[in-house]
Amino acid sequence: MSATELRLAVVGAGGRMGRQLIQAINQQQGVVLGAAFERTNSSLIGADAGELAGIGHIGITVTDNLLAQVGQFDILIDFTRPEGTLSHLAFCVEHHKGMIIGTTGFDEEGKKAINCAAQTIPIVFAANFSVGVNLVLKLLEKAAKVMGSYSDIEIVEAHHRHKVDAPSGTALAMGESIAETLGRDLKDCAVYQRVGHTGERDPRSIGFATIRAGDIVGEHTAIFADIGERVEISHKASSRMTFANGAVKSAIWLSEKKSGLYNMKDVLSLEEL
Protein backbone atom coordinates (compact mmCIF):
# COMPACT_ATOMS: atom_id res chain seq x y z
CA MET A 1 0.00 0.00 0.00
CA SER A 2 1.42 3.37 -1.05
CA ALA A 3 1.40 6.31 1.37
CA THR A 4 -0.52 8.29 -1.24
CA GLU A 5 -3.31 5.76 -1.70
CA LEU A 6 -6.75 6.61 -0.34
CA ARG A 7 -7.82 3.99 2.20
CA LEU A 8 -11.47 2.98 2.04
CA ALA A 9 -13.56 0.89 4.41
CA VAL A 10 -16.67 -1.06 3.41
CA VAL A 11 -19.54 -1.78 5.80
CA GLY A 12 -21.65 -4.82 4.96
CA ALA A 13 -18.66 -6.36 3.22
CA GLY A 14 -20.31 -9.75 2.80
CA GLY A 15 -23.50 -8.47 1.18
CA ARG A 16 -24.22 -8.18 -2.54
CA MET A 17 -23.26 -4.52 -2.67
CA GLY A 18 -20.36 -4.89 -0.26
CA ARG A 19 -18.68 -7.49 -2.44
CA GLN A 20 -19.12 -5.31 -5.51
CA LEU A 21 -17.57 -2.38 -3.65
CA ILE A 22 -14.53 -4.47 -2.73
CA GLN A 23 -14.16 -5.49 -6.38
CA ALA A 24 -14.47 -1.87 -7.51
CA ILE A 25 -11.85 -0.71 -5.00
CA ASN A 26 -9.52 -3.46 -6.21
CA GLN A 27 -9.88 -2.27 -9.82
CA GLN A 28 -9.51 1.48 -9.16
CA GLN A 29 -6.05 3.03 -9.15
CA GLY A 30 -5.15 5.27 -6.23
CA VAL A 31 -7.39 3.56 -3.68
CA VAL A 32 -7.03 0.53 -1.45
CA LEU A 33 -9.31 -1.41 0.87
CA GLY A 34 -8.23 -0.53 4.40
CA ALA A 35 -10.94 -2.31 6.38
CA ALA A 36 -14.04 -4.44 5.92
CA PHE A 37 -16.89 -4.69 8.40
CA GLU A 38 -19.89 -6.91 9.05
CA ARG A 39 -22.58 -6.86 11.70
CA THR A 40 -21.91 -8.40 15.10
CA ASN A 41 -22.40 -12.19 15.15
CA SER A 42 -22.16 -12.45 11.36
CA SER A 43 -20.82 -15.81 10.21
CA LEU A 44 -18.50 -13.89 7.86
CA ILE A 45 -16.43 -12.30 10.62
CA GLY A 46 -12.87 -13.57 10.32
CA ALA A 47 -13.12 -14.22 6.60
CA ASP A 48 -10.76 -12.60 4.11
CA ALA A 49 -12.58 -9.73 2.39
CA GLY A 50 -10.95 -10.43 -0.96
CA GLU A 51 -11.97 -14.06 -0.93
CA LEU A 52 -15.56 -13.02 -0.14
CA ALA A 53 -15.51 -10.68 -3.13
CA GLY A 54 -14.02 -13.29 -5.45
CA ILE A 55 -10.72 -11.46 -6.02
CA GLY A 56 -8.51 -13.75 -3.96
CA HIS A 57 -6.73 -13.34 -0.63
CA ILE A 58 -5.88 -9.69 0.18
CA GLY A 59 -5.08 -9.91 3.88
CA ILE A 60 -8.00 -7.78 5.07
CA THR A 61 -10.02 -9.65 7.68
CA VAL A 62 -13.72 -8.91 8.07
CA THR A 63 -14.49 -7.63 11.58
CA ASP A 64 -17.31 -5.98 13.54
CA ASN A 65 -14.95 -3.68 15.48
CA LEU A 66 -14.74 -0.25 13.84
CA LEU A 67 -12.72 1.21 16.70
CA ALA A 68 -9.96 -1.37 16.35
CA GLN A 69 -9.60 -0.43 12.65
CA VAL A 70 -10.03 3.34 12.99
CA GLY A 71 -6.44 3.99 11.92
CA GLN A 72 -6.76 1.83 8.80
CA PHE A 73 -9.14 3.91 6.69
CA ASP A 74 -9.88 7.48 5.60
CA ILE A 75 -13.43 7.17 4.25
CA LEU A 76 -16.21 4.73 5.13
CA ILE A 77 -18.61 3.48 2.44
CA ASP A 78 -22.02 2.41 3.75
CA PHE A 79 -24.80 0.79 1.69
CA THR A 80 -26.54 -0.99 4.57
CA ARG A 81 -29.71 -0.03 6.46
CA PRO A 82 -30.70 3.25 8.14
CA GLU A 83 -30.24 2.15 11.75
CA GLY A 84 -26.77 0.76 11.05
CA THR A 85 -25.72 3.70 8.92
CA LEU A 86 -26.68 6.21 11.62
CA SER A 87 -24.56 4.31 14.13
CA HIS A 88 -21.61 4.36 11.72
CA LEU A 89 -22.27 8.05 11.08
CA ALA A 90 -21.85 8.86 14.77
CA PHE A 91 -18.58 6.91 14.78
CA CYS A 92 -17.28 8.80 11.75
CA VAL A 93 -18.16 12.16 13.30
CA GLU A 94 -16.34 11.23 16.50
CA HIS A 95 -13.24 10.11 14.61
CA HIS A 96 -13.50 12.60 11.74
CA LYS A 97 -13.82 10.14 8.89
CA GLY A 98 -15.53 10.99 5.61
CA MET A 99 -18.56 8.94 4.55
CA ILE A 100 -20.14 7.75 1.34
CA ILE A 101 -23.78 6.94 2.14
CA GLY A 102 -25.76 4.88 -0.36
CA THR A 103 -28.26 3.59 2.19
CA THR A 104 -31.91 4.41 1.42
CA GLY A 105 -35.09 4.44 3.49
CA PHE A 106 -34.17 7.16 6.01
CA ASP A 107 -36.96 8.96 7.85
CA GLU A 108 -36.84 12.72 8.41
CA GLU A 109 -34.92 12.34 11.67
CA GLY A 110 -32.30 10.23 9.94
CA LYS A 111 -31.87 12.81 7.19
CA LYS A 112 -31.50 15.54 9.83
CA ALA A 113 -28.77 13.52 11.53
CA ILE A 114 -26.87 13.28 8.24
CA ASN A 115 -27.23 17.02 7.66
CA CYS A 116 -25.98 17.73 11.16
CA ALA A 117 -23.00 15.39 10.78
CA ALA A 118 -22.01 17.12 7.54
CA GLN A 119 -21.18 20.24 9.53
CA THR A 120 -18.23 18.28 10.92
CA ILE A 121 -17.26 15.71 8.28
CA PRO A 122 -17.50 15.46 4.47
CA ILE A 123 -20.35 13.25 3.24
CA VAL A 124 -21.62 12.22 -0.18
CA PHE A 125 -25.22 11.09 0.32
CA ALA A 126 -27.06 9.82 -2.75
CA ALA A 127 -29.94 7.48 -3.48
CA ASN A 128 -28.06 6.18 -6.51
CA PHE A 129 -24.37 6.40 -7.43
CA SER A 130 -24.81 5.47 -11.09
CA VAL A 131 -23.63 8.15 -13.52
CA GLY A 132 -26.57 7.29 -15.79
CA VAL A 133 -29.20 7.67 -13.08
CA ASN A 134 -27.84 11.04 -12.06
CA LEU A 135 -27.86 12.19 -15.66
CA VAL A 136 -31.52 11.05 -15.80
CA LEU A 137 -32.28 13.23 -12.76
CA LYS A 138 -30.91 16.21 -14.66
CA LEU A 139 -32.94 15.29 -17.76
CA LEU A 140 -36.08 15.07 -15.61
CA GLU A 141 -35.60 18.69 -14.57
CA LYS A 142 -35.51 19.67 -18.24
CA ALA A 143 -38.58 17.56 -19.08
CA ALA A 144 -40.52 18.91 -16.11
CA LYS A 145 -39.83 22.49 -17.18
CA VAL A 146 -41.20 21.80 -20.67
CA MET A 147 -44.01 19.28 -20.07
CA GLY A 148 -44.58 19.02 -16.34
CA SER A 149 -47.29 21.63 -15.95
CA TYR A 150 -49.73 19.87 -18.31
CA SER A 151 -48.67 16.19 -18.21
CA ASP A 152 -49.70 13.29 -16.01
CA ILE A 153 -46.50 12.21 -14.28
CA GLU A 154 -45.90 8.63 -13.16
CA ILE A 155 -42.75 6.90 -11.91
CA VAL A 156 -42.36 3.12 -12.20
CA GLU A 157 -39.51 1.26 -10.51
CA ALA A 158 -38.49 -2.39 -10.34
CA HIS A 159 -35.99 -4.18 -8.09
CA HIS A 160 -35.07 -7.65 -6.89
CA ARG A 161 -37.23 -9.55 -4.41
CA HIS A 162 -34.87 -8.83 -1.49
CA LYS A 163 -35.15 -5.02 -1.51
CA VAL A 164 -36.83 -3.94 1.72
CA ASP A 165 -37.89 -0.32 1.07
CA ALA A 166 -40.44 1.00 -1.43
CA PRO A 167 -40.55 3.12 -3.44
CA SER A 168 -36.82 3.00 -4.00
CA GLY A 169 -34.66 5.90 -2.98
CA THR A 170 -33.94 6.55 -6.64
CA ALA A 171 -37.65 6.70 -7.50
CA LEU A 172 -38.19 9.18 -4.69
CA ALA A 173 -35.22 11.23 -5.89
CA MET A 174 -36.79 11.31 -9.36
CA GLY A 175 -40.07 12.48 -7.86
CA GLU A 176 -38.35 15.12 -5.78
CA SER A 177 -36.43 16.41 -8.80
CA ILE A 178 -39.66 16.78 -10.79
CA ALA A 179 -41.67 18.24 -7.90
CA GLU A 180 -39.00 20.78 -7.02
CA THR A 181 -38.77 21.92 -10.64
CA LEU A 182 -42.55 22.41 -10.69
CA GLY A 183 -42.61 24.24 -7.36
CA ARG A 184 -44.45 21.42 -5.60
CA ASP A 185 -43.79 19.53 -2.37
CA LEU A 186 -43.52 15.80 -3.06
CA LYS A 187 -45.07 15.00 0.33
CA ASP A 188 -48.25 16.76 -0.83
CA CYS A 189 -48.49 15.48 -4.40
CA ALA A 190 -47.12 11.91 -4.26
CA VAL A 191 -49.55 9.01 -4.72
CA TYR A 192 -48.05 5.69 -3.65
CA GLN A 193 -50.96 3.33 -4.23
CA ARG A 194 -54.31 3.20 -5.98
CA VAL A 195 -56.88 0.68 -4.78
CA GLY A 196 -60.61 0.46 -5.42
CA HIS A 197 -62.66 3.39 -6.67
CA THR A 198 -60.04 6.14 -6.74
CA GLY A 199 -61.90 8.75 -8.77
CA GLU A 200 -60.22 10.84 -11.45
CA ARG A 201 -56.53 11.50 -11.32
CA ASP A 202 -55.40 14.69 -9.58
CA PRO A 203 -53.56 16.56 -12.36
CA ARG A 204 -50.94 17.83 -9.90
CA SER A 205 -50.13 14.39 -8.52
CA ILE A 206 -46.99 12.33 -9.13
CA GLY A 207 -47.78 8.62 -9.06
CA PHE A 208 -45.45 5.81 -8.01
CA ALA A 209 -45.62 2.13 -8.92
CA THR A 210 -43.34 -0.53 -7.44
CA ILE A 211 -42.30 -3.95 -8.74
CA ARG A 212 -40.36 -6.47 -6.64
CA ALA A 213 -39.37 -9.61 -8.53
CA GLY A 214 -36.53 -12.01 -9.21
CA ASP A 215 -33.04 -10.57 -9.46
CA ILE A 216 -33.80 -7.21 -11.11
CA VAL A 217 -30.84 -4.94 -10.29
CA GLY A 218 -32.76 -1.70 -10.76
CA GLU A 219 -35.04 -0.15 -13.37
CA HIS A 220 -36.66 3.29 -13.25
CA THR A 221 -38.95 5.05 -15.71
CA ALA A 222 -40.53 8.49 -15.44
CA ILE A 223 -43.55 9.03 -17.67
CA PHE A 224 -44.85 12.43 -18.81
CA ALA A 225 -48.18 11.60 -20.46
CA ASP A 226 -50.40 14.02 -22.37
CA ILE A 227 -53.30 13.40 -24.76
CA GLY A 228 -51.84 11.96 -27.96
CA GLU A 229 -48.25 11.55 -26.80
CA ARG A 230 -46.04 10.67 -23.88
CA VAL A 231 -42.37 10.95 -23.07
CA GLU A 232 -40.61 8.23 -21.06
CA ILE A 233 -37.18 8.67 -19.53
CA SER A 234 -35.69 5.39 -18.33
CA HIS A 235 -32.61 3.93 -16.75
CA LYS A 236 -31.89 0.20 -16.46
CA ALA A 237 -28.96 -1.17 -14.49
CA SER A 238 -27.63 -4.59 -15.44
CA SER A 239 -24.95 -4.80 -12.74
CA ARG A 240 -24.39 -3.40 -9.25
CA MET A 241 -20.86 -2.62 -10.36
CA THR A 242 -22.09 0.65 -11.85
CA PHE A 243 -23.18 1.76 -8.36
CA ALA A 244 -19.96 0.50 -6.79
CA ASN A 245 -17.75 2.31 -9.29
CA GLY A 246 -19.70 5.51 -8.72
CA ALA A 247 -19.28 5.20 -4.96
CA VAL A 248 -15.53 4.66 -5.22
CA LYS A 249 -15.11 7.62 -7.58
CA SER A 250 -17.20 9.70 -5.17
CA ALA A 251 -14.84 8.76 -2.35
CA ILE A 252 -11.86 9.96 -4.38
CA TRP A 253 -13.66 13.24 -5.04
CA LEU A 254 -14.66 13.57 -1.37
CA SER A 255 -11.12 13.05 -0.11
CA GLU A 256 -10.32 16.67 -0.94
CA LYS A 257 -13.23 18.06 1.10
CA LYS A 258 -13.07 19.02 4.78
CA SER A 259 -16.79 18.99 5.59
CA GLY A 260 -20.19 19.43 3.95
CA LEU A 261 -23.07 17.44 2.50
CA TYR A 262 -22.71 16.59 -1.17
CA ASN A 263 -24.56 14.52 -3.76
CA MET A 264 -23.78 13.09 -7.17
CA LYS A 265 -24.68 16.34 -8.88
CA ASP A 266 -21.70 17.84 -7.07
CA VAL A 267 -19.41 14.90 -7.84
CA LEU A 268 -20.32 14.93 -11.55
CA SER A 269 -20.66 18.74 -11.87
CA LEU A 270 -24.15 18.25 -13.32
CA GLU A 271 -25.30 21.71 -12.27
CA GLU A 272 -23.04 23.06 -15.02
CA LEU A 273 -25.07 21.30 -17.75
UniProtKB/Swiss-Prot annotation:
GO cellular component terms listed in the entry, alphabetical order: cytosol
InterPro entries tied to this protein: DapB_C, DapB_N, DapB_N_CS, DHDPR_bac, NAD(P)-bd_dom_sf
Keywords assigned: Amino-acid biosynthesis, Cytoplasm, Diaminopimelate biosynthesis, Lysine biosynthesis, NAD, NADP, Oxidoreductase
Gene Ontology molecular function, alphabetical: 4-hydroxy-tetrahydrodipicolinate reductase; NAD binding; NADP binding; oxidoreductase activity, acting on CH or CH2 groups, NAD or NADP as acceptor
Positions in coiled-coil regions: none
The protein's annotated pathway: Amino-acid biosynthesis; L-lysine biosynthesis via DAP pathway; (S)-tetrahydrodipicolinate from L-aspartate: step 4/4
Catalytic reaction(s) noted: (S)-2,3,4,5-tetrahydrodipicolinate + NAD(+) + H2O = (2S,4S)-4-hydroxy-2,3,4,5-tetrahydrodipicolinate + NADH + H(+); (S)-2,3,4,5-tetrahydrodipicolinate + NADP(+) + H2O = (2S,4S)-4-hydroxy-2,3,4,5-tetrahydrodipicolinate + NADPH + H(+)
GO biological process: diaminopimelate biosynthetic process; lysine biosynthetic process via diaminopimelate
Keyword NADP attached: yes
Keyword Transferase: no
EC number: 1.17.1.8
Pfam families, per database record: DapB_C, DapB_N
Location in the cell: Cytoplasm
Residue numbers binding NADP(+): 39
Catalytic residue positions: 159, 163
Residues that hold NAD(+) according to the record: 12-17, 38, 102-104, 126-129
Enzyme class: oxidoreductase
Chain positions recorded as (S)-2,3,4,5-tetrahydrodipicolinate binding sites: 160, 169-170
Family, as annotated: Belongs to the DapB family.
NCBIfam families registered for this protein in UniProt: dapB
Entry function: Catalyzes the conversion of 4-hydroxy-tetrahydrodipicolinate (HTPA) to tetrahydrodipicolinate.
Subunit details: Homotetramer.
PANTHER family for this protein: 4-HYDROXY-TETRAHYDRODIPICOLINATE REDUCTASE 1, CHLOROPLASTIC-RELATED (PTHR20836:SF0), DIHYDRODIPICOLINATE REDUCTASE (PTHR20836)
Protein name, entry field: 4-hydroxy-tetrahydrodipicolinate reductase
Originating species: Proteus mirabilis (strain HI4320)
